[in-house]
């Protein structure tokens, strides 16, 4: 018999029981809970095909289950607040055919406790759609029913569903309505990303910042547990509609803190995570009220040592957990053995930090 157990949650909060599912036919298995190498004295009971551990103190634990000659080992953690420990993943398929939640089940088994819903929105400047089914900004079919199902599955599994939200991107229509909200070059040209998204001025004095914060609040009111505040890494020097320079290193920390406050008016447990693309502007945003430090890695940070350094410096600046979006070359386009070795080396460098 092959013994495979599953935790019912990706992470546990203090006061919650820890539940493990058992294969059919397994009765009264031997169970040992560890903290590092030390056994933890706790009473374990079985109810049907479920092992139930009592609420445990904050910490990380291992558990071994034996039934006859078969053995299974796993691990789990207990935290006071899920924002204290972040293991980050993402989902990107929300069509009418994607209302099932096997993807969330898989993330639960991997212990991811925060999941970004990437490109779920109707528009960059209007996150929630006017109808249930819609086309996202890239023209892909999207269904709110699928999003609702995955949000509910995440919350039931101890996973925080995080809504993607770009901090300064707007469609041409909104730019035409509010050109005074845009960011400009020094010679007065409106700045665009990929030729179709307009950069908006995030300074507190600009109406755009109130607009996007209201959109973030709506997303949390819809059911999300926070916002992934995305940036594109550039530009770094911009001007407003009156040809005045806008200091993004000053404006971004203020926006992050205002966003954290805004989403918590809808849900006190909600939070924000800001994408400091290629570690910019790390020193400015490190001490903001974001839940974790998130760095999307691009050249010239393309060596293993760079991954190590990014994490060490970000942790030193912020005292928070660090999430790296470090993109490996797709395995389909590379030698499989070489790609796996590259992954293992990357993981070793990250773990060493």
What are these regions (language model features)?
Residues 204-293, 298-318:
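Active-site neighborhood of glycoside hydrolase catalytic domains
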Residues 40-84:
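Extended acidic/polar, glycine-enriched regions
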Residues 285-288, 304-353:
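Active-site-proximal substrate-binding groove within the catalytic cores of carbohydrate-active enzymes
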Residues 93-97, 163-222:
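Active-site-adjacent "subsite" loops/lids of carbohydrate-active enzymes
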Residues 94-109, 208-220, 276-284, 339-347:
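Short, acidic/polar
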Residues 121-147, 174-203, 233-250:
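Aromatic- and acidic-residue-enriched carbohydrate-binding clefts of CAZyme catalytic domains
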Residues 72-123:
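An acidic-aromatic substrate-binding cleft motif
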Residues 1-26:
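Extracellular ectodomain segments of secreted/surface proteins
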């Amino acid at each position: 018999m092959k013994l495979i157990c599953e935790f019912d949650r990706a992470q546990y909060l203090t006061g919650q029981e820890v539940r493990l599912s058992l294969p059919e036919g397994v009765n009264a298995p031997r169970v040992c809970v560890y903290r590092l190498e030390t056994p933890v004295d706790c009473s374990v009971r079985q109810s049907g095909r479920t092992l139930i551990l009592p609420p445990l103190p904050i910490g990380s634990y291992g558990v071994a289950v034996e039934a006859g000659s078969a053995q299974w080992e796993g691990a789990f953690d207990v935290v006071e607040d899920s924002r204290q420990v972040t293991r980050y993943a993402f989902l990107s398929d929300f069509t009418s055919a994607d209302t099932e939640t096997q993807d969330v089940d898989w993330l639960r088994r991997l212990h991811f406790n925060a999941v970004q819903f990437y490109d779920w929105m109707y528009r960059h400047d209007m996150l929630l759609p006017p109808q249930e089914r819609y086309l996202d900004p890239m023209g892909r079919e999207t269904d709110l029913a699928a999003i609702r199902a995955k949000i509910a599955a995440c919350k039931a599994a101890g996973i925080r569903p995080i809504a993607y939200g770009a901090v300064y991107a707007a469609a041409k229509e909104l730019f035409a309505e509010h050109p005074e909200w845009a960011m400009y070059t020094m010679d007065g040209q409106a700045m665009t990303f990929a030729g179709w998204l307009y950069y908006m001025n995030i300074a507190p004095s600009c109406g755009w910042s109130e607009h996007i914060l209201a959109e973030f609040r709506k997303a949390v009111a819809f059911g999300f547990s926070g916002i992934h505040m995305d940036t594109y890494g550039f530009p770094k020097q911009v001007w407003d509609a009156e040809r005045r320079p806008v200091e993004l290193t000053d404006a971004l920390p203020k926006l992050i803190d205002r966003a954290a406050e805004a989403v918590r008016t809808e849900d006190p447990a909600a939070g924000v995570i800001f994408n400091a693309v290629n570690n910019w502007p790390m020193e400015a945003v490190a001490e903001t009220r974001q839940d974790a430090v998130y760095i999307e890695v691009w050249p010239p940070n393309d060596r293993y040592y760079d991954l190590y350094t990014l994490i060490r410096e970000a942790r030193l600046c912020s005292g928070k957990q660090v999430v790296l979006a470090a993109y490996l070359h797709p395995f389909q386009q590379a030698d499989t053995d070489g790609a796996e070795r590259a992954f293992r080396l990357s993981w070793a460098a990250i773990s060493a930090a």
